[in-house]
UniProtKB/Swiss-Prot annotation:
PROSITE patterns: KAZAL_1, KAZAL_2. InterPro entries: Kazal_dom (IPR002350), Kazal_dom_sf (IPR036058). Gene3D superfamilies: 3.30.60.30. Residues 1-58 form the Kazal-like domain. This is Proteinase inhibitor PSKP-2. Disulfide bonds join C6-C36, C14-C33, C22-C58. Skin. Keywords: Disulfide bond, Protease inhibitor, Secreted. Signal peptide: none annotated. May have a role in mucosal defense against microbes by interacting directly with their membranes. It comes from Phyllomedusa sauvagei (Sauvage's leaf frog). It comes from the Eukaryota. It is found in: Secreted. GO terms for cellular component: extracellular region.
Length: 58
């Protein structure tokens, strides 16, 4: 399990590149930034604890 490096995306738009990540919630995100945006924008406490389960498809 990998901690996403969300600090590097603060105040920036996500890059358009596709580098799939599989979250510990079982959902796929098109890159690490997209996962960080989901974590940031979620109001659910459980979503704040999502990590990267693995790089690539779930």
């Amino acid at each position: 399990v990998i901690e996403p490096d969300c600090k590097k995306y603060e105040g920036k738009k996500c890059p358009p590149d596709i580098a799939l990540v599989c979250g510990t919630n079982g959902r796929e995100y098109y890159n690490e930034c997209a996962l960080c945006v989901f974590i940031r924008d979620s109001t659910l406490k459980a979503d704040k604890a999502i990590k990267i389960k693995k790089w690539g498809k779930c």
